[in-house]
Amino acid sequence: MDITILGIESSCDDTSAAVIRDRTLLSNVIASQAVHQKYGGVIPELASRAHQQNIVPVVDTALKEAGVTIDKIDAIAFTRGPGLLGSLLVGVSFAKGLSISHDIPLVEVNHLQGHILSHFLDLPDRQLPHPDFPFLCLLVSGGHTQIVRVDSPLDMEIIGTTIDDAAGEAFDKCAKVMGLPYPGGPVIDRLAKEGNPKAFRLAHPHVDGYDYSFSGLKTSFLYMLRDAVADDPDFLSLIHISEPTRLGMIS
């Protein structure tokens, strides 16, 4: 028997809904929030308001693209955390209301586990390779950087994690002081592919075990950038950055 699930995600600044039938992704609709760009980061209050505006059309579109009506949904899965409290409440409240009004069971999901288990989804036109249990997963998502041992869909153990900043946070902070548009991570990734990996020397973190540390690397980058700009005020223009910089933050 095929089971059709409506998934609702609102943990940060993207409102998303998907319809899955027997591990096959039928639709996946995402509404991003451009309102945060001028602030260089996610503003929680603005994020929750945008979720309220987006969640109904996003869910409606996901159902239509999947060719499924709400009465054919067997369960509603929603993100219970981790994430921004206000954003999470929008998704949780909507999922509960939909569940009560249509008498559909609810399934709460840890969104980090959802990232890991997305490896087991298939597309309508092809089946993707699935990992065999047990396996190790490097999970890099927003405010989280972890190594997770996965023994089964419901049996996971974190064996390594960041002891300070997550990788994504370090990317975002470095992008912000360079004046890169939000989100800065993808821009840094693109610029890195065009650059010389040996051009600058940055601190290498030393952490025991399988844990990570990015705060020292971030600080090393900020000092390097400050010194480079002091030597050459046009330094940032050399790496193809045209946006106004915020170097006062690191002076």
Regions found by a protein language model. Give the residues of each.
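Conserved phosphate-binding catalytic cores of ATP/NTP-utilizing and phosphoryl-transfer enzymes
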Residues: 2, 109-135
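N-terminal beta-alpha supersecondary unit
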Residues: 2-82, 111, 235-238
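A short helix-loop
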Residues: 3, 11, 28, 131-132, ...
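Short beta-strand scaffold segments in enzyme catalytic cores
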Residues: 15-20, 137-139, 145-149
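Short Gly/Thr/Asp-enriched flexible loops that form oxyanion-binding sites at enzyme active sites
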Residues: 78-102, 121-122
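Single conserved hydrophobic/aromatic residue that forms the stacking wall/gate
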Residues: 239-251
